[in-house]
Amino acid sequence: MRIFPGNFGQRVFLKHSLLQFVGLFCVCCFLIISCGRSTSVNSPNSNTDASRVTIGTTLKIRTIDPADAYETLSAQLFYNLGDRLYAYESGSTKLIPQLATALPKISDDGLTYTIPIRQGVSFHDGTVFNAAAMVFSLDRFIKNSGRPSFLLGDLVDSVKATGEYELTIKLKKSFAAFSSLLTFPNLCAISPKVYEIGDGKFKPDTFVGTGPYQLTKYGSDSLKLDVFDKYWGEKPSNPGVNLQLLSSPVNLFNSFRTGAVDVAYLSLDPEQIRNLEKGAKEEKWYAIASQSNTVNYMVLNQKSKPLDQLEVRQAIALMIHRPLMNERVLLGQALPLYSLVPTTFSELYQPVFKDKYGDANFAQAKELLTKAGFSPTNPAKVEIWYPTGSGRRALVAQLLKALAKRHLDGLLQIEIQTVESATLYKDLEKGVYQSVLVDWYADFFDADNYIQPFLECTKGSVSGGCEKGASQGQGSFFYSEKANQLIDKERQEINPKKRQEIFAKLQTILADEVPYIPLWQDRDYTFSQKAITGVILEPTQSFLFSPIRKQ
């Protein structure tokens, strides 16, 4: 997920917070877990069926209202409880119809999308699905002003049912990746009889959609999903899923090793992953690994001294030692990254930071710091912040501090700071932090979602930085009129080769100006017991429960 509703600061808060695995909050969760409230819904399926699948995770859930949710776990639930107009073919990034019956018909000016709607679909409460129900779902997503509402609100002019089973969407301006955006998990159909439209009118513990599973229990420590027997599509391979929300990676690790959970899904620490991989090689269980699209990076606040000086930002970029970081901190479980666009976009990814700065280029870093006026008696002082409880980022910050101390002759002095994640993301847009270590999980599978949220600024200047817009919300306050123009151009360009050229220019700007420093790209790890088959991590990072079978 990413960060930004109408107010960009809220966007940042959510996008990043959903990717932080644990914090001091987890201690509190452990203490109150037995007191958690739960909501149950009647279901014909048995609660004690031995073939049900139990999935354990440390991911947190705040709400399951698709108009307001913006966390990783809620997104995965929507993939399994709901359907969208479009999805991706399993095992690929090919766009296929889901609640639509064909790809959209797009007008010559790129502003009007006409979409045929599937017939014979029912919601979990028995309400019939049609174009009017899809209009309701998309309108509510925009008008209820939840955290992800900007995704459609900034782009869509109107959504109308132009037939009982035909939908017409008009855009404010053309966007080449709009069809991909419609795969965003929160843009699922929801029952008009259960939900209502209105600013802030959310149902945080309710979900009534059209997907293969229906929610029958919602609690602070567990959720229960039963198969929807009237589902229009292929039926799941299991009778239902029990989702256990565990308070820490240690609890997830131990629960899996003792067999209390069938599948361990996000997030484990590197040492725990290495231990479980060893067990998989000994055939105790299965390990499923895939290249993730999540990027990890360092934000540099250009309004904060000394990071307002380009030479200082470039010196930090020169100092970064990604191979060592991957070896020592991440235990080889990641991929060194040299752009904000992940390597999975092979035709668009440009390793611009490798070409311009390399790794561990300490001599040139010292030259730039000296040129900027710093010395051992007058060092550049930079604070590196990270969310409390992020063990990996704590170690990365310590590594960067050690590299500066050992190799930069006192020219750069790094101080490590940590703060609770909710506070960090709330204050990011206020310019409170000099630099921050964070990550990004995209909303939809298009390279635009790794560039526009970082480099675009709707109001600002080169001298004053970004006053309103994406880069302000990210905490870099980067402003470039050229970048703004290129982003607007790539969003409207439908020719793949021309779009590729534009993305190359944008990545060059990223490397030249250094508002962010890409560090690594995650690999996702999931582990399953030997009685479990069908666990698949999709290239788009969706985790579907339907194929999982317990023998």
Identify the role of each PLM range.
Residues 56-108, 139, 208-209:
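N-terminal lobe/hinge region of extracytoplasmic solute-binding protein
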Residues 89-91, 183-236, 240, 250, ...:
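Gly/Pro-rich hinge or "lid" segments in bacterial periplasmic/extracellular proteins
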Residues 158-160, 216-224, 242-304, 327:
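Extracellular/periplasmic solute-recognition and catalytic clefts
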Residues 336-372, 388-395:
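Structural transition elements
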